[in-house]
């Protein structure tokens, strides 16, 4: 699949082929709900299209045979006209939030492409492609059930990559208060897991 980077699906695994021309460029990830369980917490997050979170990342070549992903914060910034832009860049270190071993490196003319396996990272519970800890608290979810969570579809387009996942969570005991507890007891027992369909958009 050709998008702003190539996506390969081989033997049940998703491989991203990142060109070095994308290194250092901002990629926005926006997470939204597609479907949600019938649950009292739905009024907080749960209707189709409900916003979950967003973050900006950058890919970069790490040391050795690794590719790094940094989470980018713009809490501190400065306009070029103030002559402070480079000083701000030099005084802030953006965190490395993920590292991936290189599966292969491929040359295309002047471009070098780096291939990484993203399957487990996307499928497992992490804030880049799933709920933040704050949202999980709000919806009464705790740990993710691995064998009931999976990547549904992954599609590549020229300006975006669309990832749809199904994620099942254990229900947090004692979540919510007052009316929320009463409604939760009406809709489901405290041991009923919560299954969500989520969509993650990676935008260049």
Name the predicted role of every residue range.
Residues 1-204:
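Auxiliary tRNA-acceptor-end handling modules of aminoacyl-tRNA synthetases
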């Amino acid at each position: 699949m050709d998008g702003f980077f190539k996506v390969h699906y081989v033997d049940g695994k998703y491989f991203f082929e990142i060109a070095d021309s994308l290194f250092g460029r901002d990629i926005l990830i926006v997470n939204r709900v597609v479907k949600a369980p019938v649950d009292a917490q739905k009024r907080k997050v749960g209707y189709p299209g409900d916003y979950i979170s967003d973050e900006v990342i950058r890919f970069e070549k790490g040391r050795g045979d690794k590719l790094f992903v940094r989470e980018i914060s713009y809490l501190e910034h400065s306009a070029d006209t103030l002559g402070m832009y480079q000083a701000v860049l030099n005084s802030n270190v953006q965190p490395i939030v993920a590292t991936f071993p290189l599966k292969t490196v491929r040359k295309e003319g002047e471009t070098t492409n780096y291939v990484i396996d993203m399957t487990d990272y996307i499928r497992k519970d992490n804030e880049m492609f799933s709920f933040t800890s704050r949202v999980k608290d709000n919806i009464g979810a705790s740990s993710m059930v691995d064998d009931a969570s999976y990547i549904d579809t992954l599609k590549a387009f020229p300006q975006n990559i669309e990832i749809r996942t199904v994620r099942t969570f254990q229900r947090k005991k004692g979540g919510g208060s007052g009316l929320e507890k009463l409604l939760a007891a009406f809709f489901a027992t405290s041991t009923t897991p919560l299954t969500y369909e989520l969509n993650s958009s990676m935008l260049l």
